[in-house]
Design a protein with these regions (language model features):
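Conserved N-terminal entry element of GNAT/NAT acetyltransferase domains
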Residues: 1-15, 19, 159-161
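Conserved GNAT-fold acetyl-CoA-binding loop/helix
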Residues: 25-54
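Conserved beta-strand in the GNAT
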Residues: 66, 72-81, 88, 93
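A conserved beta-turn-beta hairpin within the catalytic core of GNAT-like acetyltransferases
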Residues: 81-92, 99, 117, 149-151
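Conserved acetyl-CoA-binding loop-helix of GNAT-fold acetyltransferases
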Residues: 94, 100-113, 134, 138
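Short glycine/proline-centered loop/turn elements that form peptide/ligand docking sites
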Residues: 108, 129-132, 149-154
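Conserved GNAT acetyl-CoA-binding A-motif
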Residues: 114-127
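Conserved acetyl-CoA-binding loop of GNAT-fold acetyltransferases
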Residues: 116, 137-147
């Protein structure tokens, strides 16, 4: 089994992370928006997803991690922590050639371990990305809102006393 870890990203990682995020989200466009040229879905194509400058901003201003598998960067996760107990998964991406191997599940667990005081995690995903719905439910997230374009999920972590 491959070793999967997360490390805080640095400015030196910005180009590689941008390359992987662009590859990942462009694949999602092909899968979920094929033939729908006029559709804009900001969960499938988040603003700035292909911009190295935006990745540098994320690294400087947010909690941005690179996903490492077998000493190679294979993805990333960007989170925002508000206060001590609230976290938001802004973006998670895994190189499409490595998807389906449990990397995303492992990364979510690692992020939860990285922030043990966070009791509420939330995120949004496109209503079109059916694989994401299955993934987030598997990870313990519950739908709190859905519209024609977007699903909002939350995960509440209870502390055993």
């Amino acid at each position: 089994m491959s070793i999967i870890s997360i490390e805080k990203a640095t400015i030196l990682d910005a180009e590689k992370l941008t390359e992987l995020m662009t590859k990942t989200f462009d694949e999602e466009v092909k899968r979920w928006l094929y033939g729908q040229g006029d559709v804009i879905d900001y969960n499938i194509q988040p603003p700035g997803y292909s911009s190295v400058e935006m990745m540098r901003y994320s690294i400087d201003e947010l909690d941005c991690y690179k996903v490492i598998m077998d000493e190679k960067i294979t993805g990333g996760i960007i989170v925002t922590i508000s206060g001590k107990s609230y976290g938001r998964i802004d973006r998670i991406f895994v190189d499409p050639i490595y998807q389906g191997n449990g990397i995303g599940s492992h990364v979510i667990k690692l992020i939860e371990e990285e922030y043990p005081n966070v009791r509420i995690w939330d995120l949004e995903t496109s209503s079109r990305q059916l694989n994401n719905h299955h993934f987030y439910k598997k990870m313990g997230y519950e739908i709190i809102f859905k519209s024609e374009d977007e699903y909002c999920y939350v995960k509440r972590i209870t502390v055993e006393s």
